[in-house]
Amino acid sequence: MNYLFTSESVSEGHPDKVADQISDAILDEFLRQDPESKVACESFCSTGMVVVMGEVKSEAYVDIQTTVRSTINRIGYNKAEYMFDGNSCGVMSALHEQSADINRGVERGNEEEQGAGDQGMMFGYACRDTENYMPLPLYLSHRLLEILADIRHHEPELMPYLRPDAKSQFTIEYDGETHQPVKVDTIVLSTQHDEFVPASLGRMSYADAVKQYGQAKVDFEMQAKIRYDVETILIPRLKAALPEETARLVHSFILHVNPTGKFVIGGPHGDTGLTGRKIIVDTYGGKGAHGGGAFSGKDPSKVDRSAAYAARYIAKNLVAAGVADECLVQLAYAIGVARPVSVFVDTYGTAKNGLQDGEIAKKVSEIFDLRPAKIIDRFGLKNPIYAPTAAYGHMGRKPYTQAVTVQGKRKIVQFFGWELLDSVPLVKKAFGL
């Protein structure tokens, strides 16, 4: 029997994502000046204010005010009417020095034996739903909001009422036997917007339209216009951006647009934002598992982040190599200890050639060096690469290289290196595939 599975995403303007982006922008600035920086930066944002908190050990000086304000303005919160404006909001910093007790366990004379920054378990997941080995409902949720943001930033005349905050949700019907996607069942989109008068009511101010037609009529026509634009502009652009095989699944679906009827008050004025509250959006949309640790604002000595990236890399390369059609990898660490205390693999019964999950986990431990220092080196995690990860998912992104400034010099660095498939030949050889 077929079944439904749902995942959601949130836009760069969602208050929790604003906080994530602030934290990662600050982390990048520390790493840009001092790649050995140890940073745990949390951000809080609400009406007209941002508070930055956390622990740092670094030789760098970061202008917190400038970094915070430029991040907020880039997202699009640059008008006083939003009640959260990068040019005028209050910014308070409460950063202080990292605990010496923690630092003692992380920094070692032999860098290769650098201990894990904390205990815990981290998960990586991959499947064959999509070309990037991500679950389809989350993949589509991210892409829809990326396209919406692109319209808001670069073609505002198409949907001129858009504001930065938005949420999306996709429900996918799966085949009960093959567990492959059959079709999109339901799309939910809530997008923040200006109060405006649609052309159907004539040219006048919103206040005058309410006087003439009444609040209910104006708001109904306003939402009808937004829905029309979603159906005729946004959804077609989503389908055009998808691989043909995936685009064919987007048909005859249920669509909910701003189901509350109005979404004018939003962003940090509508809801408080806090770093690390969108960990399922950041990872796999509820598929697989999550160890509980957030990513943004944490330097790579924190295995919450670096080991989660490594686990995704392993799972993706295993699936791409044909070891299994679906794969969950768990890594677990003890604070101050370099090597993981356990490596676990679950292929959900999809492993090929009679392979057992325990056998796969054993080979993973042999193939991949999972000490934090080696993970950091493999993916170049001491570089300022984190700001782009803080919206639209840390996983399933397209890897690329770009020139950045580090310690006053330009260098080419890898972004989203954990999404590379460069270990597929090694995996195939190890498993005789």
Predicted regions and their residues:
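Short, charge-patterned binding micro-sites
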Residues: 40-58, 335-339
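Conserved phosphate/anionic-ligand binding catalytic regions in large, soluble enzymes, centered on
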Residues: 8-10, 14-19, 115-131, 264-289, ...
